[in-house]
Design a protein with these regions (language model features):
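Domain-level recognition of soluble alpha/beta enzyme cores
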Residues: 176-203, 208
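Catalytic metal-binding/acid-base residues of hydrolase active sites
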Residues: 40, 85, 108-109, 164
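Short beta-strand scaffold positions
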Residues: 81-82, 141, 160-161
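Active-site catalytic microenvironments for nucleophilic, acid-base chemistry
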Residues: 70, 97, 149, 172-176
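Generic beta-sheet signal
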Residues: 33, 155-163
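Phosphate-handling substructures
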Residues: 43, 54-55, 96-145, 200-202, ...
Length: 213
């Protein structure tokens, strides 16, 4: 597999990510928690692998405010965010409504795609091994550690991170994530039912919740 370009084996790469995560499952003790992907950036809009310094664009800033409104009535005791700028800024927007200070955790960062940063992500293959970047195994291990630390904070916890982090989380908990749940700044609620987890968009979480396993 090429180390300098993302090969077009999209399904296999994502399946590999989920398999690696499922092999070392996470077992949070909380009954529920929230997840929020960061607001949109220009690189998101253009589908380009982005650096950690990429800011939210105007759409992303508005999305963060809307997410804050959706989460305003939820009881949130802790907010843990990736320390990457786009996630940090999204978290701070939400945190202002709850009078909380986000805890930053580098373990929640998006996967480091190394020399692919600045190139098109339209044909992203999660199974690629980018030069100067993270292998899938390293990314999953880091994400698991960061998520375990984050979910050990006083509950309910709001995680603010990235699309890749969400995929890793889904694999670690044994749930699937439909593409409709991957939107920028779309609040999600994860609920534990016995040993199983369910995830739903916050607007739908008052209903049954979607078991996407």
């Amino acid at each position: 597999m090429s180390r300098t370009t993302a090969a077009p084996n999209l399904t296999a790469g994502l399946e590999r990510l989920l398999q690696l995560a499922a092999a070392q499952p996470l077992a949070p003790t909380c009954s529920h928690f929230f997840f929020l992907r960061h607001g949109q950036t220009e690189c998101n809009a253009q589908r380009i692998f982005q650096a950690t310094s990429e800011p939210l664009n105007a759409t992303g800033l508005a999305q963060a405010q809307h997410a804050a409104s959706l989460l305003a009535d939820q009881h949130i005791a802790s907010i843990v965010a990736s320390d990457v700028r786009r996630a940090r800024d999204t978290a701070e927007t939400v945190a202002a409504r709850h009078l909380l200070a986000p805890v930053l955790n580098s373990g929640l960062r998006e996967r480091n795609f190394g020399k692919l940063i600045g190139t098109s992500s339209r044909d992203i293959d999660w199974g690629c091994e980018p030069d100067a970047g993270e292998t899938l195994e390293v990314f999953i291990d880091r994400s698991r550690t960061g998520l375990a630390e984050a979910l050990a904070q006083p509950a309910p916890v709001l995680l603010v991170a990235h699309g890749g982090t969400l995929y890793a989380l889904a694999g670690l908990l044994g749930v699937g994530v439909e593409r409709t749940l991957l939107g920028n700044a779309q609040p999600l609620r994860f609920d534990r039912h016995g040993a199983a987890w369910r995830v739903a968009a916050l607007a739908a979480s008052a209903a049954t919740g979607t078991n996407l396993a």
